[in-house]
């Protein structure tokens, strides 16, 4: 019996106005190539770096949220290697005094341990065409935080979930958009396979995975590959692998470097960054409610466990729900149901995000409240949702169109009698115990009321009229 052991290295672009060590704008996505550069990020002689205070503070927020230990001073190091999109031939990173050590992230019933977090600058981007390579250095020098886990993950699904949780956390903290599509969240995975109970196997790294799906697919393939090697009695070779999206297979890129290969040494142009304790405490006090704290609060409000988890780890939905709940217009679980089913379905159908609509927390809460109080039927409420999504007032729509539930039993009994007279065969079937035939009669009455009667009330009145207990 074989098992996988997985660790992740997560690279997150920090949401700052300027780059990590210079004044170039950091919003390079979609810009003309090589327009967000300067002597510092191009590595020109004599250009000196200056640390970005906002980037350091963003890093502190993440470290504190994860419960990591933050040192009294940060030291930057040069990580030396040659690659065309690294104009200095070294990357300013951190080594033995990183931003944070330890901490953990909740994942189900257990916690995934964090080994370290460190700040660094990003490299540029290479575009490989036929017979040539183009370089775009807009990204070079952009602020990154790298988060390294302990090898606590066991399956590709867990790795994917961990990345989704980290994405939700940094979005909640407001320190990163963490959009894989824009390259603002990238992951390298380290995976080895061993027999259960045996020491760790040989580690293989898969580089530059830029979507959650890619991480899962790459791990699934690599675990199968290593397992087959071990079953043949052969040894897995330590290597760095790439992942080919089309084939779903990993492929060798180069042999795996060791730390010594990078020849780390302290960055001579940057003095240590001192982290005063009062600054650290100020950052700690500014932390928002974290997703796992939010999940616990939702569950305490009576929201189902799975619903609470999805809402808490989807920042846009959590923000919306947290504005709707204090209004007291609808129950927490009903709001959760509508957000996760009806609203989510309509957004998916239209290809929209929640923040791209005019749906307000109050508007949805009023619509759900109308349904919960029995003032409109489920059918009517759902039919109004597209207009409420456009910013319409649901209560005004109900008033203007006369959509309130028909609750007058006298009027309904007359419609029930008409339905029975119009559908004698269905009525006789119900009298003979074939209760499914009742649905046709209910439908007839509902059509007469334009869907404004409560189906349960119509059903009861029909059974009474047919003399069926």
Swiss-Prot record:
Pfam families in UniProt: GatB_N (PF02934), GatB_Yqey (PF02637)
Determine if ATP-binding is one of this entry's keywords: yes
Alphabetized HAMAP family for the sequence:
GatB (MF_00121)
Name the gene.
gatB
* GO terms (BP aspect): glutaminyl-tRNAGln biosynthesis via transamidation; translation
Recite the lineage of the species.
Bacteria, Thermotogati, Deinococcota, Deinococci, Thermales
Q: Which reaction does it catalyse?
A: L-glutamyl-tRNA(Gln) + L-glutamine + ATP + H2O = L-glutaminyl-tRNA(Gln) + L-glutamate + ADP + phosphate + H(+); L-aspartyl-tRNA(Asn) + L-glutamine + ATP + H2O = L-asparaginyl-tRNA(Asn) + L-glutamate + ADP + phosphate + 2 H(+)
Binding partners and assembly: Heterotrimer of A, B and C subunits.
Assigned EC number: 6.3.5.-
Q: Which family does it belong to?
A: Belongs to the GatB/GatE family. GatB subfamily.
N-terminal signal peptide: none
- What name appears for this protein in its UniProt entry? Aspartyl/glutamyl-tRNA(Asn/Gln) amidotransferase subunit B
What is the protein's known function?
A: Allows the formation of correctly charged Asn-tRNA(Asn) or Gln-tRNA(Gln) through the transamidation of misacylated Asp-tRNA(Asn) or Glu-tRNA(Gln) in organisms which lack either or both of asparaginyl-tRNA or glutaminyl-tRNA synthetases. The reaction takes place in the presence of glutamine and ATP through an activated phospho-Asp-tRNA(Asn) or phospho-Glu-tRNA(Gln).
Domain of life, source organism: Bacteria
Q: Name one GO molecular function term.
A: asparaginyl-tRNA synthase (glutamine-hydrolyzing) activity
Q: Which InterPro entries match?
A: Asn/Gln-tRNA_amidoTrfase_suB/E, Asn/Gln-tRNA_Trfase_suB/E_cat, Asn/Gln_amidotransferase, Asn/Gln_tRNA_amidoTrase-B-like, GatB, GatB_Yqey_C_2, Gln-tRNA_amidoTrfase_suB_CS, Gln_synth/guanido_kin_cat_dom
Give the species this sequence originates from.
Thermus thermophilus (strain ATCC BAA-163 / DSM 7039 / HB27)
Tell me the keywords, alphabetical order.
Answer: ATP-binding, Ligase, Nucleotide-binding, Protein biosynthesis
State the PANTHER family in the record: GLUTAMYL-TRNA GLN AMIDOTRANSFERASE SUBUNIT B MITOCHONDRIAL AND PROKARYOTIC PET112-RELATED, GLUTAMYL-TRNA(GLN) AMIDOTRANSFERASE SUBUNIT B, MITOCHONDRIAL
